[in-house]
From Swiss-Prot:
Belongs to the RuBisCO large chain family. Type I subfamily. It catalyses: 2 (2R)-3-phosphoglycerate + 2 H(+) = D-ribulose 1,5-bisphosphate + CO2 + H2O; D-ribulose 1,5-bisphosphate + O2 = 2-phosphoglycolate + (2R)-3-phosphoglycerate + 2 H(+). InterPro entries: RuBisCO (IPR033966), RuBisCo_large_chain_AS (IPR020878), RuBisCO_lsu_C (IPR000685), RuBisCO_lsu_C_sf (IPR036376), RuBisCO_lsu_fd_N (IPR017443), RuBisCO_lsu_N_sf (IPR036422), RuBisCO_lsuI (IPR020888). It is found in: Plastid, Chloroplast. The active site is at K166 (proton acceptor), H285 (proton acceptor). It is an enzyme of class 4 (lyase). Its main location: plastid. Substrate binds at N114, T164, K168, R286, H318, S370. This is Ribulose bisphosphate carboxylase large chain. RuBisCO catalyzes two reactions: the carboxylation of D-ribulose 1,5-bisphosphate, the primary event in carbon dioxide fixation, as well as the oxidative fragmentation of the pentose substrate in the photorespiration process. Both reactions occur simultaneously and in competition at the same active site.
Length: 455
């Protein structure tokens, strides 16, 4: 076309391209779009593609200085959501050149930036992303990954056990260290700083790090097993965060922790790089995730946040428990658990996986099941999550009537019983309660725990 035609034109003329063949290098996104009444789905889908890539609300003459065809996002497919009125899944393809290499921050600023406040949409949710091989390869990913972690800890063939130290706020460093020691001495692999524990007036970070390290070495010497405590390095500035990680390294501990959403992806990626360079494992907590992922029609699904974390870097991440929830949620949760652990995951809509994802040998992340679980859940957890997971019992350890160490013993005995039963070919789903009962006959600690938390 000759000259430049000013004015507002429909997005769908430029950004809705149903004939587009997606490239292997494109980043693909699946959005759940709820248009305002009267807005056709094609226009809404095209608007999403435009606003999250090259588009603006009106035609600008500087468009003529670049090749939109090369840089624009394209809405290439739209399908109605079954059982929902006026909801659509819009598939958008983004050219790889729109994104800075190795930056989750930049990827999100584009894909889930301003577009979520867009007037023509009543609501918008990012359900899934396909990260192309070429982009995955620009990320370091998890500092160590599942296999290296097992080798460092010398623990194989079973899930790992953790416990969050409670009360989360108010303990002095010395008493906190004592609780850590008792749990590790009883048989847990890890204890954990609560995500809110950073460096408050009642317990400064350096004191906590010191007493936790002492507890850890004492428990290690007495049990002959390698122990860890997730020292929370999250801080108000990146510099302070790295300072804490450096001190953890100087103490010689195996693992530190970070709140990746409140801390931010830039801070998280910096910490992940430090951890790989210095041999520290990195435990990731997902505080704030529900702000983003809880609404069914707006925000982002957790599987997207999980993929982003695997790119940014973390060796463990909290990912829900599944136990006692609805069947459907179990499939969906297992979907993103596989996305965290496996090298290659096939598209499977029944599990909420919209795209086939190839991680091209990026290390895997251990999913952490945490929150409201106790010994009676152990068979189900072992069956659902398998060996490559961390099972975290906070109250389920510290709430034991005889104290922390017996609580830890109960959990370890229950876990070992479940793993042994599984290896003998028994069905944990149907025989779980019986397996726990049998084990509690020779473990008074487990028997007491079974009594407190009736099945």
């Amino acid at each position: 076309s000759v000259g430049f035609k000013a004015g507002v034109k429909d997005y769908k003329l430029t950004y809705y391209t149903p004939d587009y063949e997606t490239k292997d290098t494109d980043i693909l996104a699946a959005f759940r779009v709820t248009p305002q009444p009267g807005v056709p789905p094609e226009e809404a889908g095209a608007a999403v593609a435009a606003e999250s890539s090259t588009g603006t609300w009106t035609t600008v003459w500087t468009d003529g200085l670049t090749s939109l065809d090369r840089y624009k996002g394209r809405c290439y497919h739209i399908e109605p959501v079954a059982g929902e009125e006026n909801q659509f899944i819009a598939y958008v393809a983004y050219p790889l050149d729109l994104f800075e290499e190795g930056s989750v921050t930049n990827m999100f600023t584009s894909i889930v930036g301003n577009v979520f406040g867009f007037k023509a949409l009543r609501a918008l949710r990012l359900e899934d992303l396909r990260i192309p091989n070429a982009y995955v390869k620009t990320f370091q990913g998890p500092p160590h990954g599942i296999q290296v972690e097992r080798d460092k800890l010398n623990k194989y063939g079973r899930p790992l056990l953790g416990c969050t130290i409670k009360p989360k706020l108010g303990l002095s460093a010395k008493n906190y260290g004592r609780a850590v020691y008792e749990c590790l001495r009883g048989g847990l692999d890890f204890t954990k700083d609560d995500e809110n524990v950073n460096s408050q007036p009642f317990m400064r970070w350096r004191d906590r790090f010191l007493f936790c390290a002492e507890a850890l070495y004492k428990a290690q010497a007495e049990t002959g097993e390698i122990k860890g405590h997730y020292l929370n390095a999250t801080a108000g500035t990146c510099e302070e965060m790295i300072k804490r990680a450096v001190f953890a390294r100087e103490l010689g501990v195996p693992i530190v922790m970070h709140d990746y959403l409140t801390g931010g992806f830039t801070a998280n990626t910096s910490l992940a790089h430090y951890c790989r360079d210095n041999g520290l494992l990195l435990h990731i907590h997902r505080a704030m995730h529900a702000v983003i992922d809880r609404q069914k029609n707006h925000g982002m699904h957790f599987r997207v946040l999980a993929k982003a974390l695997r790119l940014s870097g973390g060796d463990h991440i909290h990912s829900g428990t599944v136990v006692g929830k609805l069947e459907g949620e179990r499939e969906i949760t297992l979907g993103f658990v596989d996305l965290l652990r496996d090298d290659f995951v096939e598209k499977d809509r029944s599990r909420g996986i919209y795209f086939t994802q190839d991680w091209v040998s990026l290390p895997g992340v251990l999913p952490v099941a945490s929150g409201g679980i106790h010994v009676w859940h152990m068979p189900a957890l072992t069956e659902i999550f398998g060996d490559d997971s961390v099972l975290q019992f906070g109250g389920g350890t510290l709430g034991h009537p005889w104290g922390n160490a017996p609580g830890a013993v109960a959990n370890r005995v229950a876990l070992e019983a479940c793993v042994q039963a599984r290896n003998e070919g028994r069905d944990l789903a149907s025989e779980g309660n019986q397996i726990i009962r049998e084990a509690s006959k020779w473990s008074p600690e487990l028997a007491a725990a079974c009594e407190v938390w009736k099945e």
